[in-house]
Amino acid sequence: MFKKFVKLILPPIATKTLSFLVNFRKNKYLSHPNTLFDGDDSLFKEEIKKVDVYGEYGCGKSTKWVLNNTLANVIVVDTSKEWVNAVKIDNQSNNDRLLIHYSNVGDLGNWGRPISYQKIDSFSDYTDFIWRQKRSPKLVLVDGRFRVCCFLTSLKFAEEGTMILFDDYINRPHYHFVEKYVSRFKECGRQCMFVVPSKTEIDMIELDRDIISFRNVMD
């Protein structure tokens, strides 16, 4: 009955967002609110409290945790419009510290992955958004789409000493390409942390080539 009433008073887009939010709050990734990354979260929780600006590729449970447990300003990009709207609604009390951007990379399949290259020219909007803001993150979580490109882009634009935490890194060898530029700093379960070195230690021309090469690699 409630759903029928909602459909009568809200436009289709708002109704869709509300329905998505209901499912969002039931999602297993929002259960156990103090546990992140299936428990591999001690490194993240230790380092996030040291920074005043946090960047995130892909939004959700970690976004909410940071807003509720730190004073950091949060800059986030995601490929799902419904997911972005749900996160906004779910974090209304902290929206003054949340800058969240929906990057339209086309129709999506599972986990926000584009199902085609129809909007290939928009892929850079996703990888670059965080670094187009006035303030740069001091900690970046790579946990969404285009992960290698996001990492390399962060390496290019981040200040020396910035921490980059790469989720699902340890057991996915295809991500290990990034060690061409920087060595592992710390590990925590499935995650690996890197620290951005001085730009003088990076071949920036080669880095730009690799960013272009990985721009269209969605995973």
List the predicted regions and their residue ranges.
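Membrane-proximal basic amphipathic "stem/tether" segments
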Residues: M1-T35, R209-D219
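Glycine-rich phosphate-binding "P-loop"
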Residues: F20-L36, K45-V51, D107-F129
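Short, glycine/acidic-rich beta->alpha junctions
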Residues: L36, Y57-G58, R145-V148
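A generic local structural motif
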Residues: D38-F44, K61-T63, S124-I130, C150-T153, ...
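SAM cofactor-binding core of SAM-dependent methyltransferases
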Residues: D38-N110
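Internal catalytic-core helix/loop-beta-alpha segment
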Residues: H101-T153
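C-terminal substrate-binding/active-site "lid" region of AdoMet-derived donor-dependent transferases
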Residues: I130-K134, K138-D219
